[in-house]
């Protein structure tokens, strides 16, 4: 029989329906707390659980007194809403290790031969301690503590592992938090926040629109299943610090939310995942590496659990408030390593001298781009239209096929032509740079016919390739449709030497914006289990250290050349720990309303410590791709950009960046105008907000027209106006709006930080359409009405007090 158990807090009066909670005597101040007994009134008083209760400012937690399992979690904002759906067989921690054959094995708390759980404290706070010994009859012990005070926001969790069994522990999963699929409240409000996804952040809703979006529903299989294999980190970038850009998860509905985070300031490697674990879903954390083969280690940081009310912005704000106090969070306006040319927000334009038309055909070399000097008049057309300087990113230049590092030299157009083109660009006030393909070794390219087996052997490639626990080379998987490549380990000296040599050579050509770590998503270091590299044989904090070491060598190369204008970037949002190492980050955002709607500007909300660019990437619906993408870049604080075509226009298609130029998509004139207006606002009155500021939770905006159309059999429904709230250094408040349509849009804006005006001089509306205009915007307190011209953007800026 399935029972629902309820608890009674000392803060609640009376018994809750369906349950009675008994406080046993003998738990006086300073003495060990006795467990409470939960009885079900409908079962004749039969005991169903023995529990310890811990309380914080915002929630009440209950633990099984026999094994320390978290069995109840209730927010004080919704005391009748149970978050937990813990099954009796769920462990409280798991340990993944490698056996003598270097195969993965897993141990759980349920295999402990000795278990002791105590709870000490009084009304001022309690500490739950659980100790587990002789796990699977090995000389292996785990102890964890949970500390909670009714005056503090979070419960704090810590764990210590003592390994005298001599096994190689790869990771420890802790805590074990299994939440209910159904939380009650408004069903459509149930949402999950994940600080990782290919564009910037992911929001999974319980009941999304009918667009194929993922849903929180185990029946539909939208979440991957929890299993031992799900936590085997042997390749890729899906970890922190890396593609997982921050260390928190949030799960909420319209009534309350649960927040889980690691407060790690030193870049220890971990994975945070949301997985299907019947009867609920699991908010999981695995802590990788640095566990001793002999001896003890306490986790170097706390895991915190707390509650919140609101939406994903409110959950993310909790994490941001902590993250911005850490060593990596130097505000952009205080950084001294960001060159002036980048602070001027040049429009980023990608040039592809080597073109794989649809990622299925042999390489094409466009005659319009070679020799490289032919690009200059085409770029001049772009610069004239957008009325801004350019950052020209050369892509697909490799002799052996696009993205075929490291055997890629010489450039297909020749180095002399390239250097001359860089000079011509610099004469016009532009910068030239490139994207590489990160720390991997391409040994075969289908489009160019390249076979690099001999080069791989000649240059000792095997010495720098990442290895699986069995010692096999790690083959990349996502790129197999057009090339074959190995992941390379930054913990191998050869990997770093080749990388530094290539970056040094590019600096010598005059390149300044360099994205070497393209495809190391989020500035990730690939995991490696090699026995002969400069690191322990498995993932761990060495990965963070080797990224720092590599970036320091890049900086020495630019300083040694006197190239102070060189910047480094990485694909997607640079993870928080690596923010000081990079000056810009290539965020491939998906615009509002795009397809499944899972993408959210989480990265842009959390971090603005390096400059965000969009360049050639980003998703937006056709045939208005450039207009929509540029409008989204505007309100989310990114430099706009696009792909150059042979007639000096942008590729205005929602397609891969290597797509064919013809037939054209959308209006070239509208694309130019949207980029121009966005850039004018960003470089002008919006600079303190969009460049140096911080994104806030958005205002309420009424009157936004939904634009609906069908194009190439794809239905689209996109808001006509995008908007975001921002705060400049010093506290000035502003609301940024962008109208990507060719129609005038009138909106009503509501926000508590909009003061009432008498003379109309407290708030100004600064618009960027055909000309940059500044005008007073009078109105009642908390309200303003705004009219946006077609293809325009604006900022409602509250004057400094």
Role assignments for model-derived ranges:
Residues 284, 296-302, 543-771:
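Active-site-proximal substrate-binding groove within the catalytic cores of carbohydrate-active enzymes
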Residues 20-49:
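C-terminal segment of N-terminal export signals and the immediately downstream linker at the start
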Residues 438-505, 599, 603:
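Active-site-adjacent "subsite" loops/lids of carbohydrate-active enzymes
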Residues 357-460, 497-498, 542-552:
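Aromatic- and glycine-enriched glycan-recognition loops and surfaces
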Residues 778-801:
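C-terminal beta-strand-rich structural cap/linker in extracellular carbohydrate-active enzymes
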Residues 54-65, 69-76, 81-391, 412, ...:
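Carbohydrate-recognition beta-sandwich/jelly-roll modules
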Residues 5-27:
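N-terminal export signals
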Residues 487-577:
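Active-site neighborhood of glycoside hydrolase catalytic domains
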């Amino acid at each position: 029989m399935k029972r629902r158990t309820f608890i009674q807090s000392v803060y609640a009066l009376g018994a809750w329906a369906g349950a009675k909670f008994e406080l046993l005597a003998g738990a006086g101040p300073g003495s060990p707390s006795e467990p409470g007994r939960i009885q079900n009134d409908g079962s004749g008083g039969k005991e169903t659980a023995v529990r310890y209760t811990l309380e914080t400012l915002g929630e009440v937690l209950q633990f099984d007194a026999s094994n320390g399992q978290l069995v109840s979690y209730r927010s004080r904002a919704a005391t009748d809403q149970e978050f937990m759906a813990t099954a009796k067989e769920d462990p409280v921690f798991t340990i993944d290790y490698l056996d003598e054959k270097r195969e993965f094995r897993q141990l759980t708390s349920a295999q402990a031969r000795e278990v002791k759980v105590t709870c000490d404290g009084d009304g001022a706070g309690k500490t739950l301690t659980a100790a587990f010994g002789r796990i699977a009859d090995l000389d292996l012990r785990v102890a964890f503590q949970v500390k909670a005070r009714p005056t503090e926001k979070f419960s704090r969790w810590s764990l210590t592992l003592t390994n005298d069994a001599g096994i190689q522990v790869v990771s420890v999963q802790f805590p074990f938090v299994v939440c209910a699929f159904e939380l009650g409240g408004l069903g459509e409000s149930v949402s999950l926040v994940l600080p990782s996804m290919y564009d910037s952040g992911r929001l999974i809703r319980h009941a999304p629109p009918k667009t194929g979006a993922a849903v929180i529903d185990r029946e539909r299989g939208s979440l991957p299943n929890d299993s031992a294999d799900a936590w085997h980190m042997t390749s890729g970038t899906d970890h922190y610090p890396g593609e997982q850009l921050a260390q928190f998860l949030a799960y909420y509905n319209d009534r309350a939310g649960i927040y889980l985070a690691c407060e790690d300031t030193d870049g220890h490697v971990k994975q945070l995942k949301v997985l299907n674990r019947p009867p609920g879903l699991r908010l999981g954390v695995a802590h990788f590496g640095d566990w001793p083969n002999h001896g003890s280690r306490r986790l170097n940081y706390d895991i915190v659990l707390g509650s919140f009310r609101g939406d994903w912005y409110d959950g993310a704000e909790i994490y941001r408030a902590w993250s911005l106090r850490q060593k990596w969070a130097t505000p952009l306006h205080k950084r001294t390593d960001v060159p002036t040319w980048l602070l001027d927000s040049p429009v980023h334009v990608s040039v592809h001298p080597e073109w794989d038309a649809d990622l299925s055909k042999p390489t094409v070399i466009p005659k319009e781009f070679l020799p490289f000097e032919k690009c200059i008049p085409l770029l001049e057309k772009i610069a004239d239209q957008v009325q801004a300087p350019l950052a020209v990113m050369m892509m697909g230049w490799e002799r052996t096929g696009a993205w075929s590092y490291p055997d890629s030299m010489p450039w297909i157009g020749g180095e002399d032509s390239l250097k001359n083109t860089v000079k011509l660009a610099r004469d016009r006030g532009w910068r030239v740079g490139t994207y590489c393909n990160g720390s991997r070794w391409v040994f075969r390219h289908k489009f160019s016919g390249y076979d690099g087996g001999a080069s791989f052997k000649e240059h000792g490639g095997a010495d720098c390739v990442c290895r699986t626990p069995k010692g096999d080379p790690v083959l990349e998987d996502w790129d197999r449709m057009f090339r074959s490549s190995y992941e390379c380990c930054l913990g191998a000296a050869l990997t770093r030497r080749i990388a530094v040599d290539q970056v040094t050579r590019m600096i010598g050509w005059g390149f300044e914006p360099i994205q070497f770590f393209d495809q190391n998503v989020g500035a990730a270091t690939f995991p490696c289990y090699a026995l002969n590299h400069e690191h322990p044989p498995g993932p761990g904090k060495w990965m963070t250290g080797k990224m720092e070491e590599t970036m320091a060598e890049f900086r020495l190369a630019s300083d040694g050349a006197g190239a102070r204008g060189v910047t480094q970037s990485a694909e997607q949002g640079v993870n928080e720990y690596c923010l000081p190492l990079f000056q810009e980050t290539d965020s491939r955002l998906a615009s509002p309303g795009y397809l499944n709607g899972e993408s959210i500007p989480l990265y842009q909300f959390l971090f603005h410590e390096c400059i965000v660019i969009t360049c050639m990437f980003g998703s937006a619906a056709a045939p208005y791709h450039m207009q929509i993408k540029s409008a989204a870049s505007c309100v989310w604080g990114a430099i706009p950009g696009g792909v150059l075509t042979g007639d000096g226009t942008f590729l205005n298609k929602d397609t891969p960046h290597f797509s064919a130029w013809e037939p054209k998509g959308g209006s070239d004139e509208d694309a130019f105008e949207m980029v121009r207006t966005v850039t004018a606002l960003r470089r002008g009155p919006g600079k303190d907000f969009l460049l140096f500021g911080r994104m806030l939770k958005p205002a309420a905006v009424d009157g936004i027209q939904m634009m609906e159309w069908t194009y190439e059999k794809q239905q689209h429904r996109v808001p006509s106006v995008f908007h975001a709230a921002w705060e400049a250094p010093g506290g000035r408040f502003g609301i940024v709006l962008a109208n990507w349509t060719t129609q005038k849009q009138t909106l009503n804006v509501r926000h508590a930080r909009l003061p009432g005006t008498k003379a109309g001089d407290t708030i100004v509306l600064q618009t960027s359409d055909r000309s940059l205009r500044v005008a007073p915007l009078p109105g009642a307190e908390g309200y303003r009405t705004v009219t946006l011209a077609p293809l325009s953007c604006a900022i409602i800026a509250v004057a400094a007090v």
